[in-house]
Regions:
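Conserved glycine-rich cofactor-binding loop
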Residues: 5, 12-13
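Conserved glycine-rich Rossmann-like NAD(P)H-binding loop of the short-chain dehydrogenase/reductase
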Residues: 27-42
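Substrate-binding pocket helix/loop in short-chain dehydrogenase/reductase
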Residues: 95-96, 103-108, 211
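Alpha-helical segment proximal to the catalytic Tyr-Lys
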Residues: 124, 167-168, 239
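Catalytic loop of short-chain dehydrogenase/reductase
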Residues: 132-158, 162-171, 183-184
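Short C-terminal tail/terminal secondary-structure segment
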Residues: 14, 143, 231, 242-256
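Short, small/polar-rich loop/turn modules that mediate ligand/substrate recognition or access, typified
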Residues: 170, 175, 241-243
Length: 256
């Protein structure tokens, strides 16, 4: 296998971790980026077990200088960047009329601006490699709700940002797409349900069963399923796909 390097942000847990492990099958090296080093080391062990080399970079991508650091360390370690997968970014789920300016800014700083800055900093290496970029949005971009307005708003911005990058990528030879997952049962979602369920008079397992019924889907998605979709997007089989937004949500969004 020729040398190939993927950079995955948010790789310490959930979809980010699953994606890093999945890409270890197709790339010789995977650079893992997130804030929690101990969790990143756990991911790194699984990436190595899958056959790829790793580089762990623990920093906060909401800091403006962080993107340059990631690119510099990735290039110093492996000499190239073929794929960038922007997954990092937990957005506060707070009601539209209660969320402060500071909370809005914090939500955008990591998921939107962190991904934007990192893609820009990695762009020259991606152009050289004729590489690919994936940005993580979410199906709340299609049906934003007042109780978690920032989630839908920022996810919509991510989808638009990916379209803008893909427009430039047509000229520069860089493939850019975004992914819109639906309700995936990650550790973060389970933690949320552990707080939400007792406040609504039900067990966590009751809440896990109830949500898919209300969303008219069969079940929650799994992080590994989203990782497989991302694996396809950055594979040679999808090379002619750019500027697309791929939704995987178990059929939750019923629109055409």
């Amino acid at each position: 296998m020729p040398d190939s390097v993927a950079v995955v942000t948010g790789a310490s847990q959930g979809i980010g971790r699953a994606t890093a492990i999945r890409l270890a099958r197709d790339f010789t090296s995977v650079v893992l980026v997130a804030r929690n080093r101990s969790h990143l080391e756990d991911t790194a062990a699984q990436v190595r077990a899958a056959g790829a080399g790793t580089r762990v970079i623990d920093l906060d991508l909401s800091a403006p200088a962080a993107a340059r650091t990631v690119v510099d360390e990735a290039l110093a370690a492996f000499g190239r960047i073929d794929t960038l997968v922007n997954i990092a970014g937990a957005v506060p789920q707070i009601d539209l009329f209660e969320m402060t300016d500071e909370q809005w800014d914090a939500g955008m700083a990591l998921k939107l601006h962190g991904a934007r800055r990192l893609t820009i900093e990695a762009w020259p290496a991606l152009v050289e490699a004729k590489g690919s970029v994936v940005l993580m949005s979410g199906n709340s971009a299609i049906f934003p709700k007042a109780p978690y307005a920032a989630v839908g708003t920022i996810n919509a911005a991510i989808a638009a940002l990916a379209k803008a990058f893909s427009d430039r990528g047509i000229t520069d030879g860089v493939q850019v797409n975004s992914v819109m997952p639906g309700a995936v049962l990650t550790g973060r979602r389970r933690s949320y349900l552990e707080h939400w369920a007792p406040a609504h008079g039900m067990t966590v397992e009751d809440a896990i069963s109830r949500f898919p019924q209300e969303a008219e889907i069969e079940r929650f998605g799994q992080a590994e399923e989203i990782a497989e979709l991302i694996g396809f997007l950055v594979s040679p089989a999808a090379r002619w796909m750019t500027g697309s937004t791929l939704r995987m949500d178990g059929g939750e969004v019923k629109s055409v």
